[in-house]
UniProtKB/Swiss-Prot annotation:
Residues 74-102 have a biased composition (Polar residues). It comes from Methylophilus methylotrophus (Bacterium W3A1). The lineage of its organism: Bacteria, Pseudomonadati, Pseudomonadota, Betaproteobacteria, Nitrosomonadales. GO terms for cellular component: cytoplasm. Keywords: Cytoplasm. This is Putative regulatory protein FmdB. Residues 52-68 have a biased composition (Basic and acidic residues). It is found in: Cytoplasm. May be a positive regulator of formamidase. Residues 52-112 are annotated as: Disordered.
């Protein structure tokens, strides 16, 4: 159950733990018992821990902009800083992946 904020005319702002189905209904103030309407407030990001704040930012970015990494088969980042080359077939002189997809193509794997 989420916490909702309500504002009492005499006591001020208070929070209440309520069901989501009761979110739009007014709540009774804990101090005076007066019926109080729900208020909308901004998130408390300023008092949140820096690690939590960065985790929220990271989750927001990953929702529509996933981070991708390009790596080669040798494990380096793709620019071949390790000075290795992909294995070459002795018969065709082409890298192994190209040889496999052309020579032993699988017709049932259309679109892959």
């Amino acid at each position: 159950m989420p916490l909702y904020e309500y504002e009492c005319d005499s006591c001020g702002v208070f929070t209440a733990l309520r069901k989501m189905s009761e979110s739009s209904l007014p709540a009774e103030c804990d101090c005076c018992g007066a019926v109080s309407p729900r208020i909308l407030s901004v998130p408390k990001l300023a008092i949140m821990d820096k690690l939590q704040r960065s985790a929220h930012e990271r989750n927001e970015k990953s929702a529509n902009e996933p981070r991708t990494a390009r790596r080669s088969s040798c494990g380096c980042t793709g620019s071949h800083t390790c000075k290795t080359k992909p294995p070459v077939n002795q018969d065709t002189g082409k890298p192994g992946l190209q040889m496999q997809t052309k020579k032993t193509a699988r017709p049932w794997m259309v679109g892959h």
